[in-house]
A protein has these predicted regions:
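Winged-helix/helix-turn-helix nucleic-acid-interaction surface
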Residues: 1-13, 61-62, 68-120
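Short acidic, hydrophobic short linear motifs in intrinsically disordered regions
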Residues: 51-66
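Short recognition helix of helix-turn-helix/winged-helix DNA-binding domains
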Residues: 4-50
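Short, low-complexity, polar/charged sequence segments that are solvent-exposed and flexible
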Residues: 30-35, 57-61, 109-110
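Alpha-helix N-cap/helix-initiation sites
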Residues: 32-36, 53-54, 72-76
Length: 120
């Protein structure tokens, strides 16, 4: 018998070489540890809620800022920087207010395949 359908994941994989990724290094250089923390928070919410994207509304902005004890404006600056560097897709963010990206989609498909094969 298969699992009950669920959109998000309880956990997700993280690459061990992520700290060598030039996009992550640029984010950390520009926004220090706060930038990386916000990026990881958003990734967590993406994988937890929908699995491969999140509609980042004012409520999500507030939640993120409140969690990290930051101003919403600063969180938004960091997210916009993440889109500029390609960590999130800039076009989808600007047009729809959705945060996702190529690596997020690839990881999502990989995790779905793992779940599918573990159910077989």
């Amino acid at each position: 018998m298969g699992r009950i359908a669920r959109k998000g994941f309880e956990y997700y994989r993280a690459e061990t070489d992520r700290f060598r990724d030039i996009k992550i290094r640029k984010l950390r250089k520009e926004h220090s540890c706060a930038g990386y923390a916000i990026y990881q928070y958003v990734l967590n919410e993406i994988y937890r809620v929908e699995g491969c994207y999140i509609r980042f509304t004012q409520d999500e902005l507030f939640d993120c800022a409140e969690y990290w004890n930051m101003r919403e404006e600063e969180v938004l600056r960091i997210i916009n920087y993440c889109t500029e560097t390609g960590l999130f897709n800039a076009g989808i963010w600007k047009q729809y207010g959705i945060l996702t990206g190529h690596s997020i989609q690839i990881r999502y498909v990989s995790m779905c395949c793992l779940l599918y094969t573990s159910d077989a």
